[in-house]
């Protein structure tokens, strides 16, 4: 497998640069090493970045990829002196817009987040909420959740919840359907008050067996028979409770989140 190093260089937090970096997922046969250099906002820091890029090129034997979000044109020009593949987010998008609109863009670092006003801080609040309500950790404040993902252990609830919080500012809780719930054939008591917030995830039993075996090999928990049984009982339970659900086996977190987000928006309009 081809291996390449990718630098995410920003004069702010680097969130925008890393968002662009999600496009790397379209090259599944390449292994990318991520190197983050946030707050690169001076000539000295750019010089340090240039040194790291040169060292990485020498070690890898291949040009690094540099995703940059620098608003200062002088610093951008300095960075482009490196022997790398440069993806200049500001130059590629903002500069052509400035020419078309006949307006000078703001050169203030972090403006991409500050213009969002309260929504930026709402996203941070959503992340904290999601971390505090991961895997049924607590039902305190569960009424604030915009969605509660349910499903058997290791079906993708946690990464999907975090993606919803980080990318969309959604307060996403997740709650496991444990063997006791499945045997009883009913939802955990804490969830019964919020049927409209529930959304289920399921998974192919063979895939679940593989994932669980990495964590607890040769256990009843990871056995294929148990995985098949848990999935069957969980899907039966979600069907009885009228919970919409989706199979996560062959879907990316981005795709799962988009589908769930559509449900949240439909519910919020009712």
Swiss-Prot record:
GO molecular function, one term: protein serine/threonine kinase activity
Entry-linked Pfam families: Kinase-PPPase
Reactions catalysed, as given in the entry: [pyruvate, water dikinase] + ADP = [pyruvate, water dikinase]-phosphate + AMP + H(+); [pyruvate, water dikinase]-phosphate + phosphate + H(+) = [pyruvate, water dikinase] + diphosphate
Enzyme Commission number(s) of this protein: 2.7.11.33, 2.7.4.28
Binding site for ADP: 151-158
Keywords carried by this UniProt record: Kinase, Nucleotide-binding, Serine/threonine-protein kinase, Transferase
PANTHER family: PYRUVATE, PHOSPHATE DIKINASE REGULATORY PROTEIN 1, CHLOROPLASTIC (PTHR31756:SF3)
Similarity comment: Belongs to the pyruvate, phosphate/water dikinase regulatory protein family. PSRP subfamily.
Function (record text): Bifunctional serine/threonine kinase and phosphorylase involved in the regulation of the phosphoenolpyruvate synthase (PEPS) by catalyzing its phosphorylation/dephosphorylation.
Identification of the protein by name: Putative phosphoenolpyruvate synthase regulatory protein
UniProt organism field: Methylobacillus flagellatus (strain ATCC 51484 / DSM 6875 / VKM B-1610 / KT)
